[in-house]
């Protein structure tokens, strides 16, 4: 994990160096140039800032999609790779992932986590409009995204580097961060998310003909999964019930299949 963070910061440094190599001639002599941005000058102190932060982080979460499905399903009981599958896919299915496996890189996971940490550190949750702390819903959602990403990373890697502050310098990248296994991490994430149970769910209306409410991670969904892993079944049931009740979720015949006793070889929609 530490090697990854070092490489991550080296890559960031190379990009910054390349950008710095081509300044305008006039800017080279001006120490007050407005084209230079400093970390301490960037605050997320308006509802628009928080909105764009959440959507930006979600765009990074999309990069985890293939790995999330493959690392989960290929190691499950109901799926296996064929002999014609790519070697990386076969390695996952056989629980023998090599260091060169395309899906073994955790760079994108830590990238999401680092951006979540940055937003969490910079968002001013004390801003009040009409007696409403307007930044809390986005702040809570970013915490949920970070928790989900950490959990998926831990399920894939077995343990993670627990980092709560944004890594913005080489010095920060070289620090020794505590390693957390699944049980310790699950409890840390539960403690981190519990204060935001009941936070207003995000709803940005329809975006490109898609209901934006379905883009976000329900806090009770993540909490339920964490409780379930720890064997706290009553707490898991409570979290899942809150989610079902709030969202008025129901199951109908369209969600199920049945087999009759005469012929189990074919299934029919209920």
Model-inferred region functions:
Residues 1-23:
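Sec-dependent bacterial lipoprotein signal peptides
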Residues 46-47, 51-52, 86-157, 180-183, ...:
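Conserved, well-structured interaction surfaces
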Residues 115, 185, 192, 239-242:
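Alpha-helical solenoid repeat scaffolds, predominantly canonical TPR units
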């Amino acid at each position: 994990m530490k090697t990854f963070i070092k490489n991550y910061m080296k890559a960031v440094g190379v990009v910054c160096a390349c950008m710095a190599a081509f300044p305008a001639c006039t800017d080279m002599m001006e120490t007050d140039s407005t084209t230079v941005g400093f970390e301490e000058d960037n605050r997320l102190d308006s509802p628009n800032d928080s909105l764009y932060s959440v959507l930006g982080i979600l765009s990074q979460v999309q990069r985890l999609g293939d790995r999330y499905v493959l690392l989960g399903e290929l190691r499950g009981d109901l799926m296996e790779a064929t002999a014609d599958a790519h070697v990386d896919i076969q390695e996952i299915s056989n629980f023998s992932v090599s260091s060169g496996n395309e899906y073994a890189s955790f760079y994108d996971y830590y990238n999401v986590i680092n951006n979540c940490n940055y937003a969490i550190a910079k968002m001013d949750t004390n801003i009040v409009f009409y007696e409403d702390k307007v930044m809390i819903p986005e702040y809570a959602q970013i915490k949920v995204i970070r928790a989900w990403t950490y959990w998926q990373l831990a399920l894939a890697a077995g343990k993670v580097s627990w980092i709560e502050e944004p890594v913005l310098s080489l010095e920060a990248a070289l620090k020794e961060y505590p390693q957390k296994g699944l049980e310790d991490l699950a409890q840390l994430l539960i403690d981190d998310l519990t204060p935001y149970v009941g936070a207003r769910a995000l709803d940005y209306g329809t975006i490109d003909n898609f209901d934006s409410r379905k883009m976000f991670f329900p806090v009770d969904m993540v909490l339920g999964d964490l409780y379930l892993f720890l064997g706290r079944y009553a707490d898991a049931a409570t979290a899942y019930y809150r989610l079902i009740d709030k969202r008025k979720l129901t199951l109908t015949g369209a969600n199920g299949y049945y087999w009759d006793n005469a012929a189990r070889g074919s299934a029919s929609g209920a």
